[in-house]
């Protein structure tokens, strides 16, 4: 009931004890933009100033009249909940005033593309204090600047995003806002967790659909297509990242996205694919056989090793734990398993770990934050050490497997959502390069090369850190449940 100021409850379906409730008030599902703005201001540690954010503009491809697919800037979305192009936003910290600016009405654009948001529609839809048209933006900022005191700053993310017309004496700060927003985004609120959970729900449906049909498929492209079809059919139009559907040796390529090779003669598929829901990501990886069971003992053994790595790490997730310690644990388990298989040799587990030899087979980090980005931001990277200025996600840089001291690494906090994604890979390139490195004496290359047809195994879930431990938000089948679905698919 629009504008009623209360939530009307409609019982839309009753099935035994399953009662699904729909809340019809607009306020119930509004993105908590105002709460986020206050959180960012608290991280800034100031009592006055103006935050100014620029949304994603409409942009054409180079040398083309065709627009690029729209993707909202995530920092802008965090303070607005607006997934529309060509918008702006200000937040007056002292007066606690969040203002959204929407595009001016353009008749030509409306005829061709449909009308843009009106002020009234935006005010009803979004959790902001006021909505104005873009034409008001310059004058509003000039008025704020005219009233500001000498200690107030205008906060922007990047120097390239400053307003066009400002008094020369107004001080700009393009350094403080980004880390403040990163710190705020690292801890998810209830609304954000619901979005990530829903993204995982749709992803699980798509992963299950692939398992049900994989034995009737001929190419990696069919796997990608069915995953996309299932997500879109269930309301998730966008993927959080490019789908990785690598079969055979392609499964050893961490970010393989060509997805254009035949499945025939391949043992395993590594499917790393996650839907996006209302701009929030899921990140899910499953590795499965192209048969009703594991095609070889080697494939089974590597899957079970990665399964053990993941289970042992997930069970230890709770607030106060250093994620880097879990990454070291994953390497220890990997080394022990690879020694049992005769792939690693000639030293103790600790000697091999300190040498870095295990990174040939487990070359990426154990995980990363998930949120508005699949590799989401936070106050500090999960595996960062004191003095480490590396910005990128831990999955994109070499793993710290033999770090001498982990005490400066950040601790897990309640409200964080992190992936746990161990993997074991047998890459021809990595093995060839390892022969030239100092730890080559620990690797039985003849034995390792027998595993190259497997490619690699990765298993990845999204884990919420809770007050009492953790919750696995990912429900995509794995292990024996996964195999049973593949087997049932033969008869369907």
UniProtKB/Swiss-Prot annotation:
Q: Which domain of life is it from?
A: Eukaryota
Q: Which residues bind Mn(2+) 1?
A: 283, 421, 460
Tell me what reaction this enzyme catalyses.
Answer: Release of any N-terminal amino acid, including proline, that is linked to proline, even from a dipeptide or tripeptide
Entry's EC annotation: 3.4.11.9
Listed Pfam families: AMP_N (PF05195), Peptidase_M24 (PF00557)
The main enzyme category here is hydrolase
Give the family, as the similarity comment puts it.
Belongs to the peptidase M24B family.
Quote the PANTHER family the UniProt record gives.
Answer: XAA-PRO AMINOPEPTIDASE 3 (PTHR43226), XAA-PRO AMINOPEPTIDASE AN0832-RELATED (PTHR43226:SF3)
Q: What is this protein called?
A: Probable Xaa-Pro aminopeptidase NFIA_010500
Protein species of origin: Neosartorya fischeri (strain ATCC 1020 / DSM 3700 / CBS 544.65 / FGSC A1164 / JCM 1740 / NRRL 181 / WB 181) (Aspergillus fischerianus)
């Amino acid at each position: 009931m629009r504008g009623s100021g209360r939530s009307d409850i409609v019982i839309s379906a009753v099935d035994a004890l399953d009662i699904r409730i729909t809340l019809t008030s607009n306020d119930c599902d509004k993105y908590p933009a105002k709460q986020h703005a206050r959180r960012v201001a608290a991280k800034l540690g100031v009592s006055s100033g103006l935050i100014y954010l620029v949304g994603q503009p409409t942009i054409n491809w180079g040398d083309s009249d065709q627009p690029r697919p729209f993707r909202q800037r995530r920092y802008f979305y965090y303070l607005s909940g607006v997934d529309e192009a060509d918008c702006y936003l200000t937040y007056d910290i002292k007066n606690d005033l969040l203002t959204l600016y929407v595009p001016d009405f353009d008749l030509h654009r409306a005829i061709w593309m449909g009308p843009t948001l009106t002020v009234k529609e935006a005010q009803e839809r979004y959790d902001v204090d006021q909505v104005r048209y873009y034409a008001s933006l310059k004058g509003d900022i000039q008025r704020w600047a005219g009233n500001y005191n000498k200690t107030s700053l205008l906060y922007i993310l990047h120097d390239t995003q400053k307003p066009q017309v400002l008094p020369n004496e107004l001080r700009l700060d393009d350094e403080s806002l980004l880390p403040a927003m990163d710190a705020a985004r690292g801890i998810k609120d209830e609304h954000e967790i619901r979005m990530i959970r829903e993204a995982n729900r749709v992803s699980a449906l798509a992963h299950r659909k692939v398992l049900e049909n994989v034995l009737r498929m001929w190419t990696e492209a069919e796997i990608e297509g069915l995953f996309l079809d299932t997500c879109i059919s269930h309301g998730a139009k966008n993927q959080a990242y490019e789908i990785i559907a690598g079969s055979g040796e392609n499964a050893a390529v961490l970010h393989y996205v060509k997805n254009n090779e035949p499945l025939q003669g391949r043992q395993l598929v590594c499917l790393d694919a996650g839907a996006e829901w209302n701009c929030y990501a899921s990140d899910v990886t499953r590795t499965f056989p192209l048969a009703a069971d594991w095609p070889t003992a080697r494939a089974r053994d590597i899957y079970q090793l990665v399964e053990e790595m993941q289970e042992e790490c997930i069970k230890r997730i709770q607030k106060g734990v250093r994620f880097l310690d879990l990454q070291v644990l994953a390497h220890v388990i990997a080394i022990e398993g690879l020694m049992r298989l005769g792939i690693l040799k000639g030293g103790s587990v600790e000697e091999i770990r300190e040498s870095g030899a295990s990174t040939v087979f487990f070359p990426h980090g154990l995980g990363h934050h998930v949120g508005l980005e699949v590799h989401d931001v936070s106050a500090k990277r999960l595996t960062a050490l004191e003095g480490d200025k590396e910005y990128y996600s831990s999955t994109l840089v070499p793993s710290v497997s033999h770090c001498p001291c982990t005490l400066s690494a950040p601790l897990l906090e309640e409200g964080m959502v992190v992936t746990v994604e161990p993997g074991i890979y047998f890459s021809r390139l990595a093995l060839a390069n390892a022969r030239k490195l100092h730890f080559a004496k620990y690797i039985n290359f003849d034995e390792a090369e027998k595993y190259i047809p497997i490619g690699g195994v990765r298993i990845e879930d999204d884990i919420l850190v809770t007050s009492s431990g953790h919750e696995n938000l990912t429900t995509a089948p794995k292990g024996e449940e996964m195999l049973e679905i593949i087997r049932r698919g033969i008869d369907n």
